[in-house]
């Protein structure tokens, strides 16, 4: 069993609050469930990148990259900054960054230790 004892130190959530949080988490997980979007967020955890840098880093073509960045932008996970002719992307959603860091620790850091 992962957790045998109940944690009574956490504040009790009402059913309505729990439902609201569950929907928020489900929407975030749904957005991050696409492999390209997950790779983009994993990359953007490191900082701000131009579209060209993201294309090189992740190794996907411009049409797919633009489509997936659009989904992340619409969901509020990333925002853009224009510098002359270049567009830069950065994370705006701290919860997404925390989730990606946790996933990295669980799935990637252990592989490096092996």
Curated annotation (Swiss-Prot):
<dbReference type="Pfam" id="PF01022">
    <property type="entry name" value="HTH_5"/>
</dbReference>
<dbReference type="InterPro" id="IPR001845">
    <property type="entry name" value="HTH_ArsR_DNA-bd_dom"/>
</dbReference>
<dbReference type="InterPro" id="IPR011991">
    <property type="entry name" value="ArsR-like_HTH"/>
</dbReference>
<dbReference type="InterPro" id="IPR051011">
    <property type="entry name" value="Metal_resp_trans_reg"/>
</dbReference>
<dbReference type="GO" id="GO:0032993">
    <property type="term" value="C:protein-DNA complex"/>
</dbReference>
<dbReference type="InterPro" id="IPR036390">
    <property type="entry name" value="WH_DNA-bd_sf"/>
</dbReference>
<comment type="function">
    <text>Represses an operon that comprises itself, XF_0764, XF_0765, XF_0766 and blh. Binds to a palindromic AT-rich sequence spanning the -10 region of the blh promoter and blocks transcription of the operon.</text>
</comment>
<protein>
    <recommendedName>
        <fullName>Biofilm growth-associated repressor</fullName>
    </recommendedName>
</protein>
<keyword id="KW-0678">Repressor</keyword>
<dbReference type="InterPro" id="IPR036388">
    <property type="entry name" value="WH-like_DNA-bd_sf"/>
</dbReference>
<feature type="DNA-binding region" description="H-T-H motif">
    <location>
        <begin position="51"/>
        <end position="74"/>
    </location>
</feature>
<feature type="domain" description="HTH arsR-type">
    <location>
        <begin position="17"/>
        <end position="111"/>
    </location>
</feature>
<dbReference type="GO" id="GO:0000976">
    <property type="term" value="F:transcription cis-regulatory region binding"/>
</dbReference>
<keyword id="KW-0238">DNA-binding</keyword>
<dbReference type="GO" id="GO:0045892">
    <property type="term" value="P:negative regulation of DNA-templated transcription"/>
</dbReference>
<keyword id="KW-0805">Transcription regulation</keyword>
<keyword id="KW-0804">Transcription</keyword>
<dbReference type="GO" id="GO:0001217">
    <property type="term" value="F:DNA-binding transcription repressor activity"/>
</dbReference>
């Amino acid at each position: 069993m992962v957790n045998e004892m109940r944690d009574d130190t956490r504040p009790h959530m009402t059913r309505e609050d729990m439902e609201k949080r569950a929907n928020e988490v489900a929407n975030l997980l749904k957005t991050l469930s696409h492999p390209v979007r997950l790779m983009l967020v994993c990359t953007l955890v490191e900082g701000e990148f131009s579209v060209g840098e993201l294309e090189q880093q992740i190794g996907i073509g411009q049409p797919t990259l633009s489509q997936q960045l659009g989904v992340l932008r619409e969901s509020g996970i990333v925002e853009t900054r224009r510098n002359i002719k270049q567009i830069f992307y950065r994370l705006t959603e701290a919860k997404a960054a925390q989730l990606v860091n946790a996933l990295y620790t669980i799935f990637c850091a252990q592989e490096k230790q092996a």
